Curated annotation (Swiss-Prot):
Biological process terms in GO annotation: attachment of mitotic spindle microtubules to kinetochore; cell division; cellular response to amino acid starvation; cellular response to nutrient levels; mitotic metaphase chromosome alignment; mRNA transport; nuclear pore organization; positive regulation of TORC1 signaling
Phylogenetic lineage: Eukaryota, Metazoa, Chordata, Craniata, Vertebrata
Keyword check for Plastid: no
Activity regulation: The GATOR2 complex is negatively regulated by the upstream amino acid sensors CASTOR1 and SESN2, which sequester the GATOR2 complex in absence of amino acids. In the presence of abundant amino acids, GATOR2 is released from CASTOR1 and SESN2 and activated.
Identification of the protein by name: Nucleoporin SEH1
Localization per Swiss-Prot or TrEMBL: Chromosome, Centromere, Kinetochore; Nucleus, Nuclear pore complex; Lysosome membrane
Function: Component of the Nup107-160 subcomplex of the nuclear pore complex (NPC). The Nup107-160 subcomplex is required for the assembly of a functional NPC. The Nup107-160 subcomplex is also required for normal kinetochore microtubule attachment, mitotic progression and chromosome segregation. This subunit plays a role in recruitment of the Nup107-160 subcomplex to the kinetochore.
Cross-link (Glycyl lysine isopeptide (Lys-Gly) (interchain with G-Cter in SUMO2)): K12
Family: Belongs to the WD repeat SEC13 family.
Key words, A-Z: Cell cycle, Cell division, Centromere, Chromosome, Chromosome partition, Isopeptide bond, Kinetochore, Lysosome, Membrane, Mitosis, mRNA transport, Nuclear pore complex, Nucleus, Phosphoprotein, Protein transport, Repeat, Translocation, Transport, Ubl conjugation, WD repeat
Biased composition (Polar residues): 324-354
């Protein structure tokens, strides 16, 4: 059962993103009011705003947490063409702010010449790295070589996507069989911009990212994209928020069947396709086991999707904007039964979803 709690966020404008930390006890929100707020969950389950500050000189599109082994670290990105990294500092014993925490800007990443539309930390096994994407069609990957000094970030890679970028997602798999991989979505509306999802893979030989696949069937603007946690699967699952919800599987083709030294090739299948929102879908987010997908759309609802024992994806719950459940929520979309879901456990730890627009 899902319990909904309403929070008076007190942002002065549209909230574009909601992000939970690794443990689900901290939350960050960002808004067109140029601010980020941090919320902490009390023992009673209530959320309290513990920090609020102006982060950028334009709308803040996204905010995201680093893995806690790197400390309490946030990254944000904005229409002001920058991304920023923030760290929470707790006052020392000789400080008048003893025991109190505050957030300090550690760096500003200024390489983009256009709006920075998404920012994501890499999976922790890759070290402290983050990726940004921007409206100029470039994905940039940065690394902090010294995790104790978050003011120093070096630009490691620039990936040209040829299309205005709206969202990115790292493949979270830590398997040595899988090279680092990042999916990029585009909301480019120009008539010659066809396929809106590209997947890039790191090549150990060239030490560069190369395009592995393009999802040719996704031709509508993409607002969000999310790889599912892997949990030992031999294939990858990718969710896409566009005018509907789509779930794809990417199964690696055996190396001996592909050109040596080139990027991995995949068999790509769409396994679920839902237009139940009857509107633009703005966010998709997986639970920690990669078994439940949450989506939010312009219909004002969050919908939960899960593969049943027959491996058909179905809607298992609908929450309205005020948090109340919708009766008769077992709506079905178009689902392909070829997806194997052999993980029975259902975790209730869903990441935040928010319907935010990125006018630029």
């Amino acid at each position: 059962m899902f319990v909904a709690r309403s929070i008076a966020a007190d942002h002065k404008d549209l909230i574009h993103d909601v992000s939970f930390d690794f443990h689900g006890r901290r939350m960050a929100t960002c808004s067109s009011d140029q601010s980020v707020k941090v919320w902490d969950k009390s023992e009673s389950g209530d959320w309290h705003c513990t920090a609020s500050w102006k982060t950028h000189s334009g709308s803040v599109w996204r905010v995201t947490w680093a893995h806690p082994e790197f400390g309490q670290v946030l990254a944000s990105c904005s229409f002001d063409r920058t991304a920023a990294v923030w760290e929470e500092i707790v006052g020392e014993s000789n400080d008048k702010l003893r025991g109190q925490s505050h957030w300090v800007k550690r760096t500003t990443l200024v390489d983009s010449r256009t709006s920075v539309t998404d920012v994501k930390f890499a999976p922790k096994h890759m070290g402290l790295m983050l990726a940004t994407c921007s409206a100029d069609g470039i994905v940039r990957i940065y690394e902090a070589p010294d995790v104790m000094n978050l003011s120093q970030w070096s630009l490691q890679h620039e990936i040209s996507c040829k299309l205005s970028c709206s969202c990115i997602s790292w493949n979270p798999s830590s398997s040595r069989a899988h090279s680092p991989m990042i999916a990029v979505g585009s909301d480019d509306s120009s008539p010659n911009a066809m396929a809106k999802v590209q997947i890039f893979e790191y090549n150990e030989n060239t030490r560069k990212y190369a395009k592995a696949e393009t999802l040719m069937t996704v031709t509508d603007p993409v607002h969000d994209i999310a790889f599912a946690p892997n949990l030992g699967r031999s294939f990858h699952i990718l969710a896409i928020a566009t005018k509907d919800v789509r779930i794809f599987t990417l199964k690696p083709v055996r190396k001996e069947l592909t050109s040596s030294g080139g990027p991995t090739k995949f068999e790509i299948h769409i396994v679920a396709h839902f237009d139940n929102h009857n509107s633009q879908v703005w966010r998709v987010s997986w639970n920690i086991t990669g078994t439940v997908l949450a989506s939010s759309g312009d219909d004002g609802c969050v919908r939960l999707w899960k593969a049943n024992y027959m491996d058909n994806w179905k809607c298992t719950g609908i929450l309205k904007g005020n948090g109340s459940p919708v009766n008769g929520s077992s709506q079905q979309g178009t689902s392909n039964p070829s997806l194997g879901s052999n993980i029975p456990s259902l975790q209730n730890s869903l990441n935040g979803s928010s319907a935010g627009r990125k006018h630029s």
